[in-house]
């Protein structure tokens, strides 16, 4: 008769050497997975760098093509090339600055100012961008802003004779002319006040009943005032007396006794 006994665990049958082999294989698989992850990250980084480098090269190619078109005065086509380049490298301040110059040649002042502002925003240390911005602002008549832009450009590159002799000097000359024109305009402007020109005086009908009645009332009042005159007489003792006298037959008191004051 077979005796009853507890079943042994399966793991107890696995030898120690076999267990170590399993652990080693698991570690190798883990290292391989980590290596694969690392390789994937490195490969992704390399692909990104390659893509960026390709974008830069293509952008530079489009920039050069646009510059060639601009030299041949094919401005619209040049702008299209630079817009394509900006899609690849949106942080390139030079593209915005070149685009602003071409827009100035096309007399599109507002877009030119906007493009120059974008160039300054991308690279505030570019004196070319500040110079182009100042010229675009002059095109809009913003002389004060243009002078400020030229001064910033000179602060970055103080040895540039073009900024001194052409840009800043011309802007200041325009500013002086603007001040003279304003002074002349202020002198020629008529003073504010009621308009007394002949055209502003209403044409009254002096033979109307209303005007005749008013004139008669004024004449009657003047007649009554001239008929009676009032005199204030102050005696030597200081007594004040008011006397109404007629125009005809009036007599003046003795000057030795009274002092007459009107």
Swiss-Prot record:
Q: Which residues are annotated with the PTM Phosphoserine?
A: 197
Checking PROSITE patterns in the record gives:
TPR, TPR_REGION
Please name the Gene3D superfamilies in this protein's record.
Answer: Tetratricopeptide repeat domain (1.25.40.10)
SMART domains attached to this UniProt entry? TPR
Which of UniProt's keywords are assigned here?
A: Phosphoprotein, Repeat, TPR repeat
**NAD: present as a keyword of the record?**
no
Which InterPro entries does this entry report, sorted A to Z? TPR-containing, TPR-like_helical_dom_sf, TPR_rpt
Repeat (TPR) positions are 59-92, 93-126, 127-160
Q: Does the keyword Iron apply?
A: no
Matching PANTHER family, A to Z? OSMOSIS RESPONSIVE FACTOR, TETRATRICOPEPTIDE REPEAT PROTEIN 33
Listed name of the protein: Tetratricopeptide repeat protein 33
Q: Which organism is it from?
A: Mus musculus (Mouse)
Q: Which gene encodes it?
A: Ttc33
């Amino acid at each position: 008769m077979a005796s009853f006994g507890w079943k042994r665990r399966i793991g107890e049958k696995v030898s120690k050497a076999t267990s170590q082999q399993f652990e080693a294989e698991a570690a190798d698989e883990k290292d391989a997975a980590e290596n694969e992850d690392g390789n994937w990250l490195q490969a992704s980084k390399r692909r990104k760098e390659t893509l960026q480098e390709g974008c830069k090269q293509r952008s530079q190619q489009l920039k050069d093509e646009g510059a060639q078109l601009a030299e041949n005065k094919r401005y619209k086509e040049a702008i299209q090339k630079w817009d394509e380049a900006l899609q690849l490298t949106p942080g390139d301040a030079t593209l915005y600055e070149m685009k602003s110059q071409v827009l100035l040649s096309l007399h599109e002042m507002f877009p030119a100012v906007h493009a120059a502002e974008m160039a300054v925003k991308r690279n505030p240390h570019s004196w070319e961008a500040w110079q182009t911005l100042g010229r675009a602002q002059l095109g809009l008549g913003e002389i004060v802003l243009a002078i400020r832009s030229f001064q910033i450009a000179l602060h970055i590159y103080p040895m540039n004779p073009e900024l001194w002799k052409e840009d800043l000097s011309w802007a200041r000359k325009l500013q002086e002319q603007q001040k003279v024109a304003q002074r002349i305009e202020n002198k020629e402007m008529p003073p504010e006040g009621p308009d007394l020109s002949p055209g502003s005086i209403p044409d009254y009908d002096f033979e109307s009943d209303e005007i005749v009645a008013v004139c008669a009332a004024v004449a009657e009042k003047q007649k009554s005032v001239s008929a009676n005159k009032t005199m204030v007489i102050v005696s030597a003792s200081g007594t004040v007396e008011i006397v109404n006298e007629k125009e005809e037959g009036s007599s003046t008191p003795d000057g030795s006794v009274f002092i007459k004051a009107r």
